[in-house]
From Swiss-Prot:
ATP binds at residues 217-223. This is GMP synthase [glutamine-hydrolyzing]. The gene is guaA. SUPFAM superfamilies: Adenine nucleotide alpha hydrolases-like, Class I glutamine amidotransferase-like, GMP synthetase C-terminal dimerisation domain. Keywords: ATP-binding, Glutamine amidotransferase, GMP biosynthesis, Ligase, Nucleotide-binding, Purine biosynthesis. Residues 190-383 form the GMPS ATP-PPase domain. Pfam families: GATase, GMP_synt_C, NAD_synthase. Pathway: Purine metabolism; GMP biosynthesis; GMP from XMP (L-Gln route): step 1/1. Gene3D superfamilies: 3.30.300.10, 3.40.50.880, HUPs (3.40.50.620).
Amino acid sequence: MILVLDFGSQYTQLIARRLRESGIYAEIVPFFESIENIQKKAPKGLILSGGPASVYAKDAYKPSEKIFDLNVPILGICYGMQYLVDFFGGVVAGANEQEFGKAVLEITQDSVIFEGVKTKSLVWMSHMDKVIELPKGFITLAKSPNSPHCAIENGKIFGLQFHPEVIQSEEGGKILENFALLVCDCEKTWGMQHFAQREIARLKEKIANDKVLCAVSGGVDSTVVATLLYRAIKDNLIAVFVDHGLLRKNEKERVQAMFKDLQIPLNTIDAKGIFLSKLKGVSEPELKRKIIGETFIEVFEKEAKKHHLKGKIEFLAQGTLYPDVIESVSVKGPSKVIKTHHNVGGLPEWMDFKLIEPLRELFKDEARLLGKELGISQDFLMRHPFPGPGLAVRILGEVSESKIKRLQEADFIFIEELKKANLYDKVWQAFCVLLNVNSVGVMGDNRTYENAICLRAVNASDGMTASFSFLEHSFLEKVSNRITNEVSGINRVVYDITSKPPGTIEWE
């Protein structure tokens, strides 16, 4: 196992992800992790991440110096390399020319870390400081136009000024793999088949004959959690799906069919009437979210009580992922509130359940791979993200049954055409937004005054930033024609060309 010490870089999670993609298990801890906890994890190597600070600053982040007594290989990346240079007596100073973006790395000295790596390759830079003078015993392995010491080595201590974890670094994955396999002597034992077997055995032992309540949203995470649990405890799993009437077209039927195919019993609650009555007259986005969240808890509590009377429920399952765990103990300090699944936050006190989080070691892409291993269809696993409050936040203004129907039909057409054109898997997320404006139109010989709808499609890697998708005009025209002809009450279609930032992906 490789342990990554996080110094606050926006790319830290990518280090662990790249290693895991190579079959090497990696964990992330904050730079201030105690040496006792690090020793308990027994890592075969340490990676010191990048970070936004300067090593010569008064309040610079510094790990326990005892990491050097562990006698394991260490790789410093960007700030991590500068920390190593500073610690061992070298000189780091502000660079005359800062480096952000792509640069050409030129290897000048053979090293095990560059085994099988091209002599010249593109790498990703993101630094304002640079190494001016190496500590005694260190040698330079590579340079870039603005960094004479772009990679360094002293025995089993290595430093890289660039970010190998970022996809723009052409040979970055290979370099990280070399460090783990050739320097740290790790083995490729990480994968979803092994994880599934291990986790099912662990869940069987932990839960035994107790019951587990699991809220199913129809999304990837909760479906994977429910499937994993059912493999472990069979009918002691109580999977609950609340239909709040704000789902995509045919969503309830699709989820039910999926669970039937997986042979997992599903308790479906039809709560459309309750949700719509409580949303009546409400236009403000945050109030809509609040009402939906509170109503979900009310409906979920009622269903849980029914099952609780039949036999005490000991556990509540959540789809917490590894990024949520990392964020709760980031370099900024432990969060006051650990992020929870939108469907189960704020449950009443009588639900004094123990928490089960089977996916807490996994990144999102790994959760999808686990789902595939468990037999969940690829089509389902690769669906675009969908907000917890559902279509309520894609209907601007007050929500009504007729507006939901209108949006469902338009959204169905847009997604159907994306799939027909083989574009669905090429965009990160696509959906329709029903605008709270009407516009004048002409249909046949008649004047119309009906709803406008907005098409939204974005490209992204993680949703933190996004750019609008460049869809062909002919494709957009086809979608527009279908919507205005097939969906009653819509006479105008527009396309959103706003990126994030300044906009957000969702409108509300």
